Amino acid sequence: MSNIGIDVKAPENVCEDPNCPFHGTLSVRGQIFEGIVTSDKGHDTIVIKREVTGYISKYERYEKRTTSLVAHNPACIKAKVGDTVKVMECRPISKTKSFVVIEKTENLE
């Protein structure tokens, strides 16, 4: 198991995935986001929704928006729908996947 450079709890399971930052050769860098898994139907892929708050100066109010990210789900983490996960930026794995799950924090269901 390799050290990925940030302070997260390493997964207990072991996988043979080459795109796993812990057991494979995928290096992670850049931004870290936290969100809720809304879909896990793709092969080793999850969709994450996260809320973004923005300030509108004309109305002096804040607005909530949701954005979705597509991330790689390694076999050692296996996040499911309803889980809260942390994802980190990596090199592009496919056309839409440029993030990988690094930690599963809790399940809301």
Curated annotation (Swiss-Prot):
InterPro entries: NA-bd_OB-fold, Ribosomal_uS17, Ribosomal_uS17_arc/euk, Ribosomal_uS17_archaeal, Ribosomal_uS17_CS. GO terms for biological process: translation. GO terms for cellular component: cytosolic small ribosomal subunit. Signal peptide: none annotated. GO terms for molecular function: rRNA binding; structural constituent of ribosome. Pfam families: Ribosomal_S17. It comes from the Archaea. The keyword Zinc does not apply. Keywords: Ribonucleoprotein, Ribosomal protein, RNA-binding, rRNA-binding. Belongs to the universal ribosomal protein uS17 family. PANTHER family: 40S RIBOSOMAL PROTEIN S11 FAMILY MEMBER, 40S RIBOSOMAL PROTEIN S11-RELATED. Part of the 30S ribosomal subunit. One of the primary rRNA binding proteins, it binds specifically to the 5'-end of 16S ribosomal RNA. This is Small ribosomal subunit protein uS17.
